[in-house]
Amino acid sequence: MNNQKGLSVKSVVAIGIGAAIYVILARFTSIPTGIPNTNIEIVYPFLALLATIYGPVVGFSVGFIGHALSDFLMYGQTWWSWVLATAVLGLIIGLYGMRLDLENGVFTTKQMIGFNIVQIIANVVSWLIIAPVGDILIYSEPQNKVFLQGATATITNSISILILGTILLKAYAATKVKKGSLRRD
């Protein structure tokens, strides 16, 4: 009987390595949008991959730790409302990822569509609700500014995950042996 409590070693390692890679990707792959402090982020497809493979706790943790560290290293301060939004994005995608069977090489067109519906909803919750409302409540930022940033982030992050995230998940599933695909000769 396994009464193990807490995170597995595999999850802890995924969080540590994932957060480190998050910081590197956030630092070197951000593409400015022209909206202040809002970029096209290549890091979110990576977060979606980790959250889908390892689950909601890893997705939340990598998003939270990675975003907090990258904000601090790049700007000298951390925008906690956006850190929480990133963590929630990882959490929601990770919850949906539990329904997928990537480990057995399965990522069907129907699952791709479901994944993308969920990630778009997660982006809306994160960037159109959590981040701007947090900016208003915590930092007293102007509403029109933060909702413009949130709308831009929602669109760019949704597209980024739709394209790159789907490709990463399909490629990951393709590396796994499909259940029942091996036959004895």
Swiss-Prot record:
Disulfide bonds: none
Cellular localization per UniProt: Cell membrane
Keyword Hydrolase: no
Segments crossing the lipid bilayer: 6-26, 46-66, 78-98, 113-133, 147-167
Top-rank lineage group of the source organism: Bacteria
Keyword annotations of the record: Cell membrane, Membrane, Transmembrane, Transmembrane helix
Membrane protein topology class: Multi-pass membrane protein
Main location: membrane
UniProt KW Acyltransferase keyword: no
Cellular-component GO terms for this entry: plasma membrane
Pfam families from the UniProt entry: ECF-ribofla_trS (PF07155)
Similarity section: Belongs to the UPF0397 family.
Stated name of the protein: UPF0397 protein LJ_1703
Organism: Lactobacillus johnsonii (strain CNCM I-12250 / La1 / NCC 533)
